[in-house]
């Protein structure tokens, strides 16, 4: 008997966070009735996660061999997924209920102009994070510029057509780049502010120094990939100046950080320039409007 194609694939990337991963996988009980395919990308954890996770139907672990980063892992998960809709989760995320996920699935099934669903960040007790730390403002369903990568629902065919996440980013910033390219294709991101997903940030593997370096580096790469040259010439210095602003605001000791960023950008600039496809002025204008939070998503007609 041939198994039916699942309606949903859940993809989780993890590295050396066994407790967080177990909590994340256990939280999928909320959507068990959807019978999702569950894929876990183990990014070369010191102890393979396959030995920690309980055996369950439709769960498969994909073991990476070299610690290539979660962006590469997400691309692998998307390539392996069987479903048309894929819920990507960080290992320190956890579901609180099923309604938000089902609502997102319904939007993707009904509206071919929507390619991604953004969810709201919440504490473990279900309290939402401050509005400034969410994909958008307000409590109504709306289009937004980008989702937050900790939990997002993607239309797989759009992801494949766009070439997925840029693996050169390694860590951080892939959401903005991907959503900007989606917008340039005429596709949207819808934010469900009442669809809360836990983001219990696990400190393992996180450092302020790494975050600062990669955010600055990837903002520069984003400009090289997506901006017209007239904007690149001032955006690159502006992005580099922002490194110092963030460093002092967050009190991060990183005396060699800017040198590292400059070396990385110089190394990757040639490939980025060869692959660049600047987005249109119309896309930039739409992006600014969406960041302003003034684009409500229309309720479906019965």
Where are the regions a protein language model picked out?
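Conserved donor NDP-sugar-binding/catalytic core segment of glycosyltransferases
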Residues: 94-129
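A conserved acidic beta->alpha catalytic loop
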Residues: 27, 40-50, 94
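N-proximal low-complexity "stem/linker" segments adjacent to membrane-targeting elements
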Residues: 1-27
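Non-catalytic, C-terminal membrane-associated alpha-helical segments of glycosyltransferases
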Residues: 231-302
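Glycine-rich, basic loop-to-helix element that forms the pyrophosphate-binding segment
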Residues: 64-81
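Short, acidic, metal-binding catalytic loop of nucleotide-sugar glycosyltransferases
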Residues: 26-35
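Short aromatic/hydrophobic "clamp" motif used to bind/position activated sugar donors
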Residues: 86
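A short, conserved alpha-helix in the catalytic core of glycosyltransferases
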Residues: 146, 151-154, 158-163, 168-196
């Amino acid at each position: 008997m041939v198994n039916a194609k699942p309606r949903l694939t859940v993809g989780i990337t993890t590295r050396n966070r066994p407790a967080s991963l177990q909590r994340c996988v256990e939280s999928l009980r909320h959507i068990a009735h959807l019978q999702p395919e569950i894929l876990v990308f183990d990014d070369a954890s010191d102890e393979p996660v396959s030995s920690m996770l309980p055996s369950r139907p439709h769960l498969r672990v994909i073991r990476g061999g070299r610690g290539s980063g979660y962006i590469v892992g997400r691309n692998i998960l998307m390539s392996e997924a069987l479903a048309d809709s894929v819920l990507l989760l960080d290992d320190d995320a956890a579901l609180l209920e099923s309604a938000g996920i089902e609502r997102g699935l319904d939007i993707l099934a009904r509206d071919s102009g929507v390619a991604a669903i953004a969810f709201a960040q919440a504490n473990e007790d279900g309290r939402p994070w401050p509005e400034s730390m969410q994909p958008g403002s307000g409590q109504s369903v709306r289009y937004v510029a980008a989702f937050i990568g900790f939990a997002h629902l993607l239309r797989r065919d759009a992801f494949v057509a766009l070439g997925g996440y840029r693996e050169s980013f390694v860590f951080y910033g892939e959401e903005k780049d991907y959503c900007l390219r989606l917008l340039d294709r005429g596709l949207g991101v819808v934010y469900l502010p009442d669809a809360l997903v836990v983001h219990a940030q696990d400190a393992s593997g996180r450092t302020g120094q790494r975050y600062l370096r990669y955010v600055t580096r990837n903002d520069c790469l984003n400009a090289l990939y997506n901006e017209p040259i007239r904007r690149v010439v001032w955006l690159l210095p502006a992005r580099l100046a922002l490194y110092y602003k963030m460093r002092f605001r967050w009190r991060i000791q990183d005396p060699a950080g800017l040198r590292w960023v400059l070396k990385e950008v110089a190394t990757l600039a040639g490939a980025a320039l060869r692959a660049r496809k600047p987005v249109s002025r119309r896309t930039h204008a739409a992006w600014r409007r969406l960041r302003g939070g003034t684009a409500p998503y229309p309720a479906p007609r019965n």
